[in-house]
Every structure is written in C-alpha cells, then in structure tokens.
Amino acid sequence: LNTTTLNLNTGAPNLTFRGYKRKNGDVGVRNEIWIIPTVGCVNGIINQLAEGLRRETGGKGVDAIMAYPHNYGCSQLGDDHENTKKILRDMVLHPNAGAVLVVGLGCENNQPDVFREFLGDYDQERVKFMVTQKVGDEYEEGMELLRELYAKAIQDQREDIPLSELRVGLKCGGSDGFSGITANPLLGMFSDFLVAQGGTSVLTEVPEMFGAETILMNRCRTKELFEDTVKLINDFKEYFLSHGEPVGENPSPGNKAGGISTLEDKALGCTQKCGTSYVEGVLPYGERLKVKGLNLLSAPGNDLVAATALASCGCHMVLFTTGRGTPFGTYVPTMKISTNSTLAKNKPGWIDFNAGVIVENEPMEKTCERFIEYIIKVASGEFVNNEKKGYKEIATVSYTHLRAHETV
C-alpha cells in the first residue's frame, strides 16, 4: 500500500488483499475447518473431533480447526428456533470456512435433514453431515469425514482479491470517554474509505444507537431504507418498554467509570463508527448481506451475540473498539482497537491496534493509513490476538422480538 498517494476521501485504485476465492465466487480471508453442531447435546463430541484432527494433522495447511459448541437447537420454538437455524446456516456457508462438518444428534428440533435443506445451495465436497444416533462409533466416523474435508481444504491457496470484496463488521464494547474521540471516528474514516473502494461495512448493536438514530435515518439512500431503519430502532425500543425496562439505562458501570454518563453519549460514539456514508441496506437478524456499502444489522448490544451476528451476515472480520479492554472473539477475526494508549500498553495480548495516539498529536489521517495497512495484512492472513489465543466462540439471541420471518 502506497500511503503517500492514498486519498482517504475517494479511496485508492486497485488495492488488493490475499484471500481465498470460493467455488461459488465468494471470498474468504481465512481457510479454516469448522465443526458445527445442530444441537448442544453433541458439544462434547465436536470438541473431541476438533482436538483429534488438530492432533493428527498439526493443523498444517489450514488457518485453524475449530469446534463451535452452543446450547440451542432443541427446546426452541417459533422465531427463537428460526434465529438459531439462521445463524448456524450462515456459519456453514461462510467463506472463511474451507470445509465444515455439521454434527447432529438425530432427535432434536433442529433436524439434520431439515437443516440440510435449509442451507440451500452448498458445496457438497466441502460440507459434510453426521447424525450421531445413526452411526456406531461417532468419533471414528467423524474423523473419517474430517480427513476428507481436510484433504480438500489444504488444496486452497491465497490469491489477489480486490479490496472491494472485503466486508467488515463495526462494533464497540467496554467503551470509555475516548471512544467517541479516537477509535470510533477512526473506524468511521476507515468505513468511508472501504465503501469508496466498493467494499462493505456493517453497523449493529441497535440499542446503542438510541439517542443518535436520526443521524442514520437522515443518511438512508431511499424512503424504503428510512422506513426500515425506523422499524429497526422502534422494534428494540418496544421490546424494552413491553418488559418495563427503561430504555435510557444502557451505559454499564465500566462505561460510566470511563467517562460516559448517558445513553446519548454512548450513541453518538456508536454511530461514529460508520462514518458519513449513505445507508444502502438494512438487515434482519440472521440474514446475509445482499448489497455493498454501509449496512445496518438488527442485533443487540451484547458483544458476543452482536459479533456473531456480524460474522453471520457475511463479514470477514469484526473491528471492535474498546476503552476498557476485552479478550473475546467470535468465529471470524475480531480485531481490538484501543481508544487510549494506557490500555494498549497494559493489555498487549488483547489489543491489536492503538488508536490512542490520536490524542497524542498523531493526525487521524496518518493513523487511518496505518490502520488500512494493518487491515490488509490481517485480511491476507496475519492473525489478531483472539486468533492467536484461540478465543473463538459463538452466541445467539434467545428472545423472539427479532422476528426471523420479517424484513425490517
């Protein structure tokens, strides 16, 4: 990247990263093998299978071998069940996975055969199913399937991919008084740059937008998108109010200790993460991206739930700003950007990029140029801290106001 000629307002032509081109034309930034359960009853099995393949292969030739346990897939009904199915489907189809083994029990609500149909078109050489009640030794059967998948995945090679194919999620957590001054505006500048390149950014954690939602509404490309954004906000507000919960009591103890006093403070910082671009799409929870540019996604503020939702809509990585610090990660690279240099110094095993230099007289534009360079490195294979440490988890919503059958 030649930063001397970089124009952050219009983008720079022909920027690329080294990614994986999938059979269906989609692009990934990782080539991993995932083991995904249809139901929580088989969590122990999938963990053993992942460990078995790592031990047998040493993980050579792929970026990671991961099991993703969860607690759902049974004892769920209606929208709650549909939301779980959608997130699991999105994972199976995610381009950061070079191969996926779906493991079911057999008697669960999330029936493996029904879930297979729910996937739609998928690469049957890269996605395999095992129903544990129908096989004798589930470990040996699972290992045989994983060996087949591994043999396919290790053939994949990185190639030059236009930056216009990159999709990033925008998230904050453990925010402080510097969030709206350093890291969040930095993400906004990067988001505008990526959109100018033809790429995609996605903003979520809807309850964090309360108090600054009109900023987003005024930037909707069409009347329909404006109406979708109004519904996105109001659905969450109505959910809180219907349960007698005060909408304004969002800031956490950590937020307040860090200098954020009101929900409006927090919301103004939250919305800065998406820059000044027009809103081009509004997505229901569990739905996948359909248009490039800036999108809004229906998901709560909970860090792991929201980050999982961002990955599931198709984001290749999550850019996560924090003033207090957090180690977590979801199933795509979860990059931590500190709002202050003290955090970056004290937690180098958590923080990947320090935006605190912005209040130490480094121009925002220079910081953003370094940030772009770093993101291209990560998209091309450099691990962030949550990947190095194996902090990778998933979480889904367990309430039903995020209606699976409606578009917002």
Predicted segment positions?
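C-terminal transmembrane module of polytopic membrane proteins
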Residues: 367-383
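A short C-terminal boundary segment appended to hydrolase-like catalytic domains
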Residues: 382-396
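Active-site rim loops that border cofactor/substrate pockets in soluble metabolic enzymes
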Residues: 238, 245-260, 264-305
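Hydrophobic alpha-helical bundle architecture
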Residues: 91, 284-345, 356-359
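Short acidic (Asp/Glu) and glycine-rich catalytic loops that position anionic groups and cofactors
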Residues: 125, 169-170, 209-216, 286-291, ...
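Buried, small/hydrophobic-residue-enriched core segments of structured protein domains
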Residues: 2-267, 314, 324
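Conserved small/polar residues in nucleotide/adenosyl-binding loops
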Residues: 400-407
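A structural-propensity feature for long, helix-poor, extended segments
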Residues: 344-372
